[in-house]
Amino acid sequence: MRSLIKKEIQDMHDEICCHMDKLHSNKVFIYPFNDESIEFKKKLDKIFNVNANFICDEEKDFKTSASNIVLFDEIVSHKDKSEFTIFLSNSDNDLWCIDFWKFENAGIPCENIINFKQFDYYCNLINNKIDYMEEHIKSLSLLSNDDKKTSSAYKTLDSLDKCGNVYNLLYDEISKKVYLRLIAKKIMRCKFYFDIYSPDQYFVDSIINLSPNEVFVDAGAYDGDTINKFIKLCKNKYKHIYAFEPDNSAFKNLVINAQSYDNISFVNAGLHNEAVTVKFENAIFGSSHIKSNDSNNCMQFVDKLFIKGDVLNLTPTFIKMDIEGSELAALNGFSNTIESFKPSLAICIYHKPEDIWEIPLCINNMNNNYKIFIRHHTYSDTETVCYAVN
């Protein structure tokens, strides 16, 4: 497994060098036009001897000489868009993603769309040797999204062996490629994932086949966004939906948004491997979670009931989980149900570093006939999902 990961890191390094080389052969543009763009243009010119122009949406946005400005419509109408490299100056992650989609939908190859932070990362990477990552590969000290390392219990060669076991379980070549690249990116501290992005989170049509008899368990239903998508894909033909959401504020919105649907049960509780009352943070933006041992801010936490899935006697055909790091415990709480009914699974594996090997192995232990897939569903380092279908 180590040799596969090292090769993936080398491949990633080579691809980045190739992207950087294109700066001298491609036409380079910066979008949107703002103060950061002006400073970045100076940097490209001074350090890399690259002359860049600005892109504006409309002529009224012009703030400099017209010779430096290209309208967005001109980019869209250009025949060979692979000749373009687009730099995005918005630092806000949501705005950056919107701009990324805008140019990707216009036909610019995704590898030719780079934001400023990504460019800085590329520069640092190609200016340093990659051999120094060997120690990280040995220990597999991956980082989670908040830059917390794996617990010391996982910093062993055993973790590398477990990743190898997961790799060998994966059903298709796409999953194997995504899995290796995920590990390589985490080891290399890379937070840009456009190269392994897949659309249709939880409902990848080549993996998940929905029927009119679905019993859908949505663990971490938030405000009903996934349920809305499920019902649309089912064309409103399903058997029942069970929506679990422990966050009080999100639960209220969930009921408001989904109460008009038929055959749906709302549960204002979380899922775990046992019935337990825990300290729970009602956070914003869908990131509510159980209090961790190292949390110092007790004022944010409230007592909340978490239940064991097996005691509910459900007969699910499809279980989705996005529950902020409690996925493994919730899976174990549903173990008898999963072993008995073999539902399709879509389980997030990005909240804790060890999830990328512990959760697939847990699923395989419950049913070794499952076909296991891995897909990644954002341009950043969140929303990695393990799928299992019987």
Question: Model-derived features: where do they sit?
Answer:
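Phosphate/nucleotide-binding beta-alpha loop and adjacent structural elements of enzyme active sites
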Residues: 1-29, 35-48, 60-85, 89-390
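Short beta-strand "acidic-cap" motif of Rossmann-like dinucleotide-binding folds
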Residues: 54-55, 243
